[in-house]
Amino acid sequence: MNSVSPAAAQYRSSSPEDARRRPEARRPRGPRGPDPNGLGPSGASGPALGSPGAGPSEPDEVDKFKAKFLTAWNNVKYGWVVKSRTSFSKISSIHLCGRRYRFEGEGDIQRFQRDFVSRLWLTYRRDFPPLPGGCLTSDCGWGCMLRSGQMMLAQGLLLHFLPRDWTWAEGMGLGPPELSGSASPSRYHGPARWMPPRWAQGAPELEQERRHRQIVSWFADHPRAPFGLHRLVELGQSSGKKAGDWYGPSLVAHILRKAVESCSDVTRLVVYVSQDCTVYKADVARLVARPDPTAEWKSVVILVPVRLGGETLNPVYVPCVKELLRCELCLGIMGGKPRHSLYFIGYQDDFLLYLDPHYCQPTVDVSQADFPLESFHCTSPRKMAFAKMDPSCTVGFYAGDRKEFETLCSELTRVLSSSSATERYPMFTLAEGHAQDHSLDDLCSQLAQPTLRLPRTGRLLRAKRPSSEDFVFL
């Protein structure tokens, strides 16, 4: 998919000419060490970028060239985009992850910056170990929906393990955003500089930073990372997907559910994926309940795959989308533009605020004690018009306990019922009971509606004259 990627000045990328010069370019496919020139093993883009009918050695060089070309193109494109300014209205409120900000003073701007830069940003990577089932060492060009799903799950984990007002203390190197009508507008001047840990902080802050690093490490591009790309691709194989394929938002929701189920490090969190745009409360309750009825419920991430129109977004859904993004328990929306996934986390006026995964960065070795964190946090807010939003997306929510789940249900009922006044169909629905019960009820109701009533006879093969009472005309 056509996408955007990092500024070429910041991240080194190899030129296509390097692929032609290297003598090892025609070695057979298979696991091998990291590529010192920057793009990994020579089969890095086999399934994703084509040449399925080529011989056993030639695709190695061809795919390597294609991978390098695609990464270089992404670098150039992102380098152009990042130079453009993103302006925000100084008059209108901006909603980010359920919080409202008004740029009325310098303090408001700093609070917004601190909140935005604290969200985890998971992007294309290169030079990681080969993905399952092939030799791909980069997801550049095809893994954006998986990355958007990772960001949504990461936001849920931040809410699960850290206080709701937690912010990344080291991320305040952000330049203020452009404000329309501001007396002294400012521009984004590049990524925040990496700062060493603040050892003078108290024990709670240090523990939060340790947890922050642990959450980041769970998304590392390594086969052992529970929510890393390798694990997600492995789980997608049961659905017929492989590395290099396009993943839709609904499929990614189920992959995330399986990943959390199989993670031994996250025992008090479960993921529920709705069926047919319906959240069944009893199914959620059964999922989060413990054997001891008096024990606390587990926390839950609720993922709701929806379609908000035909080929394009139906504008009648925009007010409802805004209402959901204002909800504090909303994790955002995994969607984007057609064939271009983005992670929406807020809005201002008629524009969505998003994190873009199309930023091809080198893989980070998270096994180091103080691995750098700056590439996991975005410092440049971006926005997109609602009209460009792809109608196929997945909305996420988080409830930490039973009380929060009840609060969430009340809030969703209010939002969905108020929006349905102008919509023929709501975005999704909440229902009591279990999905299985509703399926059986629907089946029974269909069977209970007769289209033809045969006369009762006391003897088989006994003819009877039909009358108007023996048939039901629909």
UniProtKB/Swiss-Prot annotation:
The gene is ATG4D. The modification Phosphoserine is found at S467. It comes from Homo sapiens. One of its GO terms (biological process) is protein processing. Residues 1-60 are annotated as: Disordered. It is an enzyme of class 3 (hydrolase). This is Cysteine protease ATG4D. Its EC number is 3.4.22.-. The keyword Protein transport applies.
